[in-house]
Swiss-Prot record:
Residues 28-67, 167-182, 292-302, 345-361, 396-415, 520-537, 549-559, 588-635, 642-662, 680-690, 711-720, 774-801, 809-819, 843-856, 872-887 have a biased composition (Low complexity). Residues 1-1011 are annotated as: Disordered. It comes from the Eukaryota. Residues 981-993 have a biased composition (Pro residues). The modification 5-hydroxylysine is found at residue 106. It comes from Neocnus comes. These protein fragments were extracted from an ancient bone collected in Haiti. The modification 4-hydroxyproline is found at residues 10, 13, 35, 41, 367, 370. Residues 282-291, 323-332, 464-473, 560-578, 700-709, 757-766, 820-834 have a biased composition (Gly residues). InterPro entries: Collagen, Collagen_superfamily. Trimers of one alpha 2(I) and two alpha 1(I) chains. Interacts (via C-terminus) with TMEM131 (via PapD-L domain); the interaction is direct and is involved in assembly and TRAPPIII ER-to-Golgi transport complex-dependent secretion of collagen. This is Collagen alpha-2(I) chain. GO terms for cellular component: extracellular matrix; extracellular space.
């Protein structure tokens, strides 16, 4: 698998041919020589290249949540006045973990208290029990197979046999090739390859089961709110050059996690531009005769910015006509961060005046070309904190800084998503050959050779005198196997010998024949239940089902008669079911097309307020009553001075689109009237009486059963049961494996001396004697002549591939070029590329002046229809010829935000895109002003605490019920958690179209700007 050429490695040596003797007389077939000695183990093979990294294992299930702290008692508190913000207190000492207390009675829900001071982070809590171990990751791919070791050397030939006549027989067959040596020890690991590029972020893994809900902790005392501090701009230091990656060091021992480091210092706040002077209040002139429209004048020059005066804020004059929009200025470098100024006292909020007269819309100026980048200015002196200036352009990205020192190990974070496997890194250099391994264990004993021919039994010799015990001589060659003698008489039973050293276990013998089936044994006692296994990995998400056909819209039912009975008693609160497990995150579908803006509905009339009735029992939420009749329009009040502009509130949710009215007949075109003076906005009519509560709706169908609960902790082991009866003796097992060869026994007594044998025949001529010693060296001869030039040698051994070079420093980003002229040409063919990332939302344009309220339209009658089915897309029309470029028309008014389109069908998963360039980092946006705190709603009384019912199965999350009637205000409780967002309000009256924004979009280098 590595793809290397191993032809350069040393090859096993070849056997040299021996010098042959003269052909001797043909002898008888001698006995087979003993097998040759096993060859020495071959050298250690090279280690193959490292295998590909295995895919990361799946994220293990989340650990069990630690025990909850004791619940706190909710004390009755009264709403306090907003005070000044206090000083942050010192960090408290770490407390001992408290024992979980009993759950207290549910207290009465109080009003939302004021935000307390942000305390310093408490001491780290006691570490919870470790979670269950995660699933083992899939094993990595097997590394490349090492080079085969050298073949064992051929054993030395056995001694030559001799025939009966003494002649040398032919050389016996070569002994069996020795078994291969044991595998060598693994070689040293090769150098670590360079890290491959970071893989794309994988899809989010399945969320672990939600932990049990802890008991509520003790509420801290409500601190007085302080004055809001000035929001400083986030400082950004210049990034240094990237450092050269050092060699990977050996992993050191894991250190003890150090304390959490202190938060870094907040960057200094940048200099803020000076505000412009407030316009002088214009006087309302008399109504003049309408003159003819004159030619358009040149745009006026923008005035210089004045410095802010020390006087109180004057009244705002009427809104003047918007001037021509100037082109964007040259792009300057970001200035140095200035020091934060002193926080001034908050000024009193002035009264809001009536809306000023709407001025005529100014002409839209053409967008200017972006100017060249100016020189970097010197840092200015720290000035007073003024109003926030406009956001400057994004600076060029700095070059990467050198890697800093390794900080202390932080707390262990939650398991991240499973990433895609990164690309395969380059193969590492082959490791050095390992040292010669130890001698391996002896191989299996070879099969016994064929039995030799039995020799003729000689006559028994005379028994000689027993000689003395001689020294142990060398072991002779194995003799011929004699015929088995007759069985002797049975001797006396010897004494039991000492127990020998148990031999090692031999190889298992062949399995014996299967015995007869024994009688069935009695059933054993039931063992204790095993521990519950860990939860397996989540399966792959199933395919999406087909979308069902939309049902027919039913006719609105008639309201049933009102029930005679009052509202029933409030039942005891059931035990909340556990939250179901979060499903796996689906693939992101393609972005649907933006729907067209729907028509804005007519506003409903505002009714007069009715008298406040007595607070009744809380009933079921009824259907909404009809709106009351519109009150009489008040007389226009005197025109007051325009008040200062209030803070920008948060954008409310878009109202539901009303039903379009019937199209009226087209009237005759009347003469063009004169522009009248816009009258002041009349007062808002009083609210109408609240409608009666409708009858209670039918009970909803019972919800589906909830998912199975989380597997509980394994129970304690049960008591050990009584011993069961003895089982029936089973059939005899198969014979055991043959034991290891025993130790060599002691040498026996020397046998009697045999008779002298007959003189044998003469032997064959002996072998050539050994080579004699070398003679003395002779004198040096004359130098020879130079030989001819030799042939070119064979090419050398192919070298190993060199290591990968270090990564070079990234080049500096080039300057942004000027945008070219707007090209005109036919539209190109539609590309087949992948959809790009959705760009960031541009900055909103300046809001136009508020127009006068339109006349209220007729109140629509009838239930709101459901959204119609989405029509099939029509056929694509043929592309017509490109028309001439017309003049740029004026920008139309901003349309009403349309309803959110239905989500499109789930598209196929696209291929992972290429890694894009790092975009320019945007400046942080200005912090919005805090809106006015709404008045807290009244809270109903708490019902009597009923007995705890049995725990039911956890159900699915039910649908949101209708809001009930508001009960009387209860005693103020402790501050609760932030509630969910309320439903969107009814659509407001349609305003007149705003002034032309005159914005334009332009982008470069992947960044999007809105002017």
């Amino acid at each position: 698998s590595g793809g290397f050429d191993f032809s350069f490695l040393p090859q096993p040596p070849q056997e040299k041919a021996g010098v042959g003797l003269g052909p001797g007389p043909m002898g008888l077939m001698g006995p087979r020589g003993p097998p040759g000695a096993s060859g020495a183990p071959g050298p250690q093979g090279f280690q193959g290249p490292a295998g590909e990294p295995g895919e990361p294992g799946q994220t293990g299930p989340a650990g069990a949540r630690g025990p909850a702290g004791p619940p706190g008692k909710a004390g009755p508190g009264k709403p306090g006045r907003p005070g000044e913000r206090g000083v942050v207190g010192p960090q408290g000492a770490r407390g001992f973990p408290g024992t979980p207390g009993l759950p207290g009675f549910k207290g009465i829900r109080g009003h939302n208290g004021l935000d307390g001071l942000k305390g310093q982070p408490g001491a780290p809590g006691v570490k919870g029990e470790p979670g269950a171990p995660g699933e083992n990751g899939t094993p990595g791919q097997t590394g490349a197979r090492g080079l085969p070791g050298e073949r064992g050397r051929v054993g030395a030939p056995g001694p030559a046999g001799r025939g009966s006549d003494g002649s040398v027989g032919p050389v016996g067959p070569a002994g069996p090739i020795g078994s291969a040596g044991p595998p060598g020890f693994p070689g040293a690991p090769g150098p670590k390859g360079e890290l491959g590029p970071v893989g794309n972020t994988g899809p989010a893994g399945p969320a672990g089961p939600r932990g049990e809900q802890g008991l509520p902790g003790v509420s801290g005392p409500v601190g007085p709110p302080g004055n809001p501090g000035a929001n400083g701009l986030t400082g950004k230091g210049a990034a240094g050059l990237p450092g050269v990656a050092g060699a990977p060091g050996l992993p050191g021992p894991r250190g003890i996690p150090g304390p959490v480091g202190a938060s870094g210092a907040t960057g200094a706040r940048g200099l803020v531009g000076e505000p412009g002077p407030a316009g002088s209040k214009g006087e309302s002139g008399g109504k003049g005769e309408p003159g003819s429209a004159g030619p358009q004048g040149p745009p006026g020059s923008s005035g210089e910015e004045g410095k802010r005066g020390n006087g109180e804020a004057g009244s705002t004059g009427p809104t003047g006509p918007p001037g021509l929009r100037g082109g964007p200025g040259s792009r300057g470098l970001p200035g140095a961060d200035g020091r934060a100024g002193v926080i001034g006292p908050a000024g009193a909020r002035g009264a809001s005046g009536p809306a000023g007269v709407r001025g005529p819309s100014g002409d839209t100026g053409r967008p200017g070309e972006p100017g060249l980048m100016g020189a970097r200015g010197l840092p200015g002196s720290p000035g007073n904190v003024g109003p926030a200036g406009k956001e400057g352009p994004v600076g060029l990205p700095g070059i990467d800084g050198r890697p800093g020192p390794i900080g202390p190990a932080g707390a262990r974070g939650e398991a991240g998503n499973i990433g895609f496997p990164g690309p395969k890194g380059p193969a590492g250099d082959p490791g050095k050959g390992g040292e010669k391994g130890h001698a391996g264990l002896a191989g299996n004993r070879g099969a016994p050779g064929p039995d030799g021919n039995n020799g003729a039994q000689g006559p028994p010799g005379l028994q000689g005198v027993q000689g003395g015990k001689g020294e142990q001589g060398p072991a002779g060659p194995p003799g011929f196997q004699g015929l088995p003698g007759p069985a002797g008489t049975t001797g006396e039973a010897g004494k039991p010998g000492e127990r020998g050293i148990p031999g090692e276990f031999g190889l298992p013998g062949p399995a014996g024949p299967r015995g007869e089936r024994g009688p069935p044994g009695e059933s054993g006692a039931v063992g204790p239940s095993g521990a519950i296994g860990s939860r397996g990995p989540s399966g792959p998400p199933g395919p999406d089902g087909n979308k069902g056909e939309p049902g027919v819209v039913g006719a609105p039912g008639t309201a049933g008669p009102a029930g005679s009975g009052g509202p029933g008693e409030r039942g005891a609160a059931g035990i909340p079911g556990g939250k179901g497990e979060k499903g796996e995150t689906g693939l992101r579908g393609e972005v649907g097309t933006t729907g067209r803006d729907g028509a804005r509905g007519a506003p409903g009339a505002v009714g007069a307020p009715g008298p406040a009735g007595a607070t009744g029992d809380r009933g079921e939420a009824g259907a909404a009553g009809p709106a009351g009749p519109a009150g009489p329009r008040g007389s226009p009040g005197e025109r007051g001075e325009v008040g200062p502009a209030g803070p920008n509130g948060f954008a409310g949710p878009a109202g539901a689109a009303g039903q379009p009215g019937a199209k009226g007949e087209r009237g005759t075109k009347g003469p063009k009237g004169e522009n009248g003076i816009v009258g002041p906005t009349g007062p808002v009519g009083s609210a109408g009486p609240a409608g009666p509560n409708g009858p209670a709706g039918p009970a909803g169908s019972r919800g589906d059963g909830g998912p199975p609960g989380v597997t509980g902790f394994p129970g304690a082991a049960g008591r050990t049961g009584p011993p069961g009866p003895s089982g029936i003796t089973g059939p005899p097992g198969p014979p055991g494996a043959a034991g290891k060869e025993g130790l060599r026994g002691p040498r026996g007594d020397q046998g009697p001396v045999g008779r002298t044998g007959e003189t044998g025949a003469g032997g064959p001529p002996g072998f050539t004697g050994e080579k004699g010693p070398s003679g003395e060296p002779g004198t040096a001869g004359p130098p020879g002549t130079a030989g001819p030039q030799g042939l070119l040698g064979a090419p050398g051994i192919l070298g190993l591939p060199g290591s990968r070079g270090e990564r070079g420093l990234p080049g500096v980003a080039g300057a942004v070029g000027e945008p070219g002229p707007l090209g005109i040409g036919p539209p190109g063919a539609r590309g087949d590329g992948l959809p790009g990332h959705k760009g960031e939302r541009g900055y909103a344009g300046n809001a136009g002046p508020v127009g006068a309220a339109g006349a209220p339209g007729p109140h629509g009658v009838g239930p709101a229809g459901k959204h119609g089915n989405r029509g099939e897309p029509g056929p694509v029309g043929s592309v017509g010829p490109v028309g001439a470029l017309g003049p740029r028309g004026p920008s139309g008014p901003q349309g009403i935000r349309g309803d959110k389109g239905e989500p499109g069908e789930k598209g196929p998963r696209g291929l992972p895109g290429l890694k894009g360039h790092n975009g320019l980092q945007g400046l942080p946006g200005l912090a919005g002003q805090h809106g006015d705190q709404g008045s807290p709603g009244p809270v109903g009384p708490a019902g009597p605490r009923g007995p705890a019912g049995p725990s039911g199965p956890p159900g699915k999350d039910g649908r949101t019920g209708h809001p009930g009637a508001v009960g009387p205000a209860g005693i103020r409780g402790s501050q609760g958690s932030q509630g969910p967002s309320g439903p969107p309000g009814p659509p407001g009256p349609p305003g007149p179209p705003g002034a032309s924004g005159g914005g334009y979009d332009f982008g470069y280098e992947g960044d999007f700007y809105r002017a």
